[in-house]
């Protein structure tokens, strides 16, 4: 029997009773989409998945992206699955160790934006019995609704420039060992403009579509006014009332929609506290006629 339990907070729900390693029926897929629209973040506990099963489940919701910036961290034979891990084998990291440690929404820098992330917690570090490496979210439905009416009016119809290199270099400036992007990688991910407000395809409601990780400029404003407005928006969208933290357990699949949330990874574990998470990125091309 499938059971849905709300977190009781602004975001988050748990769906139990679905085996994601089996083909997902249309009825179950529709249930997941409904809960995803209502709650933004969905946890499926006690799963046992291969990388291919993770990709097959994720593909039921849209086209899967293949990451071009971290090709050496792809799952062998399943390039749509990216490995996020601090484990080192034979002197080499098996995955990207410091992914997502600043507030962002995935693929906002892409002409086709992301619809959802699907992550599988194969190995989760614990200390004194407490799971580490939580993922924190903020609701962009709530952020939009909480904006002053005059600012909503002034920003309506405007667009924001998103740049992948902003996030990448921000991580390097904070000590990440990731190398600078190559010219080919930069060409593959050029800056892209997106509407500052989007109509969410699952809810039909407006969301604030900007984030501290990738957003660099409001195109229609002078530079100083753009900087000041973005600084206000970044602070506003991190209002504690809009936020929710999901704590991992081994075997969890965590799925969230990228249009109405921003998120960050909490890196509260050390290099010897091993974490292994496998990720699929579902693109929003299937939903674009409704955005």
Where on the chain are the PLM-derived regions?
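Non-heme Fe(II) oxygenase catalytic core, chiefly the N-lobe of the double-stranded beta-helix
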Residues: 2-253, 259-291
């Amino acid at each position: 029997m499938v059971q849905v339990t709300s977190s009781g907070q602004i975001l988050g729900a748990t769906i139990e009773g679905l085996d994601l390693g089996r083909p997902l029926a249309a009825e179950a897929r529709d249930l997941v989409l409904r809960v995803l629209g209502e709650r933004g973040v969905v946890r499926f506990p006690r799963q046992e998945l291969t990388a291919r099963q993770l990709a097959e489940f994720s593909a039921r919701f849209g086209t899967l992206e293949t990451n071009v910036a971290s090709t050496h961290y792809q799952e062998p034979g399943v390039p749509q699955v990216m490995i996020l891990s601090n484990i080192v084998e034979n002197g080499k990291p098996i995955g990207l160790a410091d992914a997502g440690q600043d507030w962002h929404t995935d693929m906002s820098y892409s002409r086709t934006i992301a619809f959802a992330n699907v992550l599988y917690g194969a190995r989760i570090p614990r200390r004194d019995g407490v799971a580490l490496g939580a993922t924190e979210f903020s609701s962009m439905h709530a952020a939009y609704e909480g904006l002053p009416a005059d600012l909503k009016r002034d920003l309506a119809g405007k667009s924001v420039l998103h740049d992948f290199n902003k996030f990448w270099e921000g991580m390097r400036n904070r000590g990440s060992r990731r190398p600078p992007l190559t010219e080919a990688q930069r060409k593959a991910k050029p800056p892209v403009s997106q509407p500052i407000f989007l109509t969410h395809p699952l809810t039909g409601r407006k969301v604030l579509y900007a984030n501290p990780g990738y957003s660099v400029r409001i195109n229609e404003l002078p530079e100083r006014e753009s900087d000041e407005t973005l600084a206000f928006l970044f602070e506003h969208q991190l209002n504690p009332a809009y936020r929710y933290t999901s704590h991992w357990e081994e075997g969890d699949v965590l799925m969230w929609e990228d249009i109405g949330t921003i998120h960050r990874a909490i890196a509260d574990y050390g290099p010897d506290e091993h974490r292994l998470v496998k990720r699929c990125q579902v693109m929003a091309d299937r939903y674009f006629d409704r955005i």
